[in-house]
């Protein structure tokens, strides 16, 4: 994987582009040492950041990784995705050297139940009037588009 990172960095045309290397060692239960070894190799290959991920609900192994990584590297941005370990705050993560928190699927997962409820109501009444109070006005959607 280091070769792919190196190739990506060699092909980079602008500083506005970053390569963030995702470490799957903890998810695959390959251990902390494997995760740290990969992170070090990926940074050496040119990765601009490291993303560490875990499927455990307890954030302890993520914090352990962050602390150990920060002992040898204080500069490279650290990224986490707290989908499983969702009790930890951004502030707590920052104390352990995390620079970026990605909420990868929470918005999508929360939107689906609302869409299902709306679809049920439309199917039940064969019209959309009953769901009007749940809808974002079109003018607000246009405002959102204009700000992009």
Segments from the language model and where they lie:
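Alpha/beta enzyme core
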Residues: 1-101, 110-120
């Amino acid at each position: 994987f280091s070769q792919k990172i190196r190739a990506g960095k060699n092909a980079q045309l602008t500083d506005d582009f970053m390569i963030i290397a995702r470490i799957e060692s903890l998810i695959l239960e390959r251990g902390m040492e494997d995760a740290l070894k990969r992170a070090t190799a990926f940074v050496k290959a040119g990765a601009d950041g490291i993303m560490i991920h875990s499927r455990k609900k307890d954030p302890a192994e993520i914090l352990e990784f962050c602390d150990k990584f920060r002992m040898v590297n204080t500069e490279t941005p650290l990224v986490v995705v707290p989908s499983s370990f969702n009790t930890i705050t951004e502030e707590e993560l920052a104390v352990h050297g995390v620079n970026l928190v990605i909420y990868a699927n929470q918005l999508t997962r929360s939107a689906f139940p609302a869409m299902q409820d709306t679809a049920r109501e439309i199917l039940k009444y064969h019209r959309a009037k009953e769901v009007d109070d749940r809808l974002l006005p079109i003018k607000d959607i246009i405002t959102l588009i204009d700000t992009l």
